[in-house]
Design a protein with these regions (language model features):
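Extended catalytic core of nucleotide-activated donor transferases of GT-like folds
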Residues: 5, 43-136
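Conserved catalytic-core segment of nucleotide-activated headgroup transferases in glycan assembly
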Residues: 20-24, 31, 37, 153-155, ...
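A charged, aromatic-enriched C-terminal amphipathic alpha-helix characteristic of glycosyltransferases
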Residues: 26, 284-289, 296-328
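Short beta-strand->alpha-helix junction loop in the catalytic core
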Residues: 109-111, 147-158, 200-202
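Acidic donor-binding loop of glycosyltransferase active sites
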Residues: 225-240, 253
Length: 332
């Protein structure tokens, strides 16, 4: 089977060299890792970005390409399956070029529904029950499903040798004002120490008990490991299922998530207060009891086991198996 993943645009907001890797084992992109995890020996796969010029053959059956312009590109690679990561109109010319391929769309965030210009998908993946319900109402003839967003398992795992220097990990770019900095920094109690991994917000200062800096994605796990637990507080109108949820669970950190975040709640959060399985992962809370929940998690760290839950329910292997089964059942 031939797989094609449309990955998006070569980064415009940072150095494109940050996503250049010589070995697939070093690649920090979860979507490249997911595609690679789906492959059998007899399969072939390509991953495309637009807005660049690069070809990297990672293995005998997996190639990454940066293509200057999708609209004018004529491919000799004929995909049986096309996975669209992101809901970009730039993909439409590629999708129309291969009318018989099985087309999967995972837009997420604001782009969670197909946009005008192309609707002929065979499967639409969603982050949350709310998004799935709307999608089924708008596109009742297209199969749609909830989907787990894993972490790059080649990088995100516990580092027990690293000392815990902070109570809380808050991985969120301050340049994106929907990530929750205003709420977190304006209400953070003084007894907690917090590490913010991301660009500093420009519109206000962070408290004295906050340390903030940006690291490359490949370096994040070792900085996450400096913390005892994690928090997520994004704006639900813009983002959905932030990747840091799976990444912190994969690193073994229990999490507290604001209840406005759009994600598959029952899949990621197994509460210690009301457990659904033997491995608790964290708590889903309102703004009113957010910091009370943080204190509760810190007081009960040894009762959570997010790493084991992640391996059994959220890993790359689980996500890849899910997609292969969907493809087999629905079409190819």
């Amino acid at each position: 089977m031939n797989f094609l993943m449309l990955r998006g645009q070569v980064p415009q907001d940072r150095d494109p060299q940050e996503i250049v890797f010589d070995k697939i084992e070093d690649c920090d992109d979860v979507w490249a890792q997911l595609l690679f995890s789906m492959l059998k020996k007899e399969d072939q796969a390509e991953l495309w970005y637009w807005g660049g010029n690069r070809e990297k053959k990672f293995t005998f059956n997996f190639t990454e390409r940066w293509i200057p312009n999708f609209q004018t590109y004529k491919s000799v690679f004929i995909p049986d399956v096309i996975f669209c990561r992101g809901g970009f109109k730039e993909y439409h010319s590629v999708l129309k070029q291969f009318p018989t391929s099985f087309k999967i769309r995972y837009g997420a965030g604001r782009r969670y529904l197909p946009c005008q210009g192309f609707y002929d998908y065979d499967l639409i993946l969603q982050d949350s029950i709310e998004q799935l319900k709307i999608c089924k109402q708008r596109f009742p003839r297209i199969p749609s499903s909830l989907f787990i967003k894993p972490a790059p398992d080649n990088l995100f795992y516990p580092y027990p040798e690293i000392k815990k220097e902070y109570d809380i990990c808050f991985p969120a770019n301050g340049s994106q004002n929907f990530k929750g900095h205003a709420f977190v920094y304006n209400t953070l109690p003084p007894q907690f120490t917090l590490l913010n991994l991301g660009n500093n917000p420009h519109n206000f200062k962070y408290p004295n008990n906050v340390t903030s800096y940006r690291v490359l994605k490949s370096e994040m796990p070792k900085h996450i490991a400096k913390c005892k637990m994690g928090i997520i507080a994004v704006d639900s109108e813009i983002d959905s299922c932030p990747r840091v949820i799976a990444e912190m669970l994969a690193c073994g950190l229990p999490i507290v998530v604001l209840d406005t975040v759009r994600f598959w709640r029952d899949k990621y959060i197994n509460s210690l207060v009301n457990p659904k399985s033997r491995w608790a992962t964290g708590e889903l809370v309102t703004k009113d009891n957010f910091w009370t929940a943080v204190q509760y998690v810190l007081d009960n760290l040894n009762k959570y086991n997010p790493r084991e839950y992640y391996k059994e329910n959220l890993s790359l292997e689980i996500a890849a198996k899910f997609l292969r089964e969907k493809i087999n059942v629905l079409g190819v």
